[in-house]
């Protein structure tokens, strides 16, 4: 997930010009890959290209920190029919090609316990560079609720502030 990294890893500041850019991984992924802070890591991902071609790309990162799995949130990933609602990884029905034969028992166990909770977090600016499309550079905007605030009042307050700045 592309996020303001300091929200899940306080003390880690992402500098946009830093090369390779930082990535924060959860402790499950760190154990699986046997990595720690300071190690290099290559991220492989898909990018939609016009006209609807799915292309595999890779990017290099430096592990800036390891956080507990609880630092993540399964709601960071948008709901995606055919994926989010699948009871198992083997049950995925994505609209893009994927080799489900690569799914290991450990991956199924992760899905069962944590669903769409991200395993890695990159700075939002880097995510926008990597995954920007003709539809935009963000899939969602998350607005945290401060202690003592009511979440049901958040849409009204956000709309008021947005209108005031237009």
Model-derived regions, located:
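Alpha-helical transmembrane segments of bacterial inner-membrane membrane proteins
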Residues: 1-166
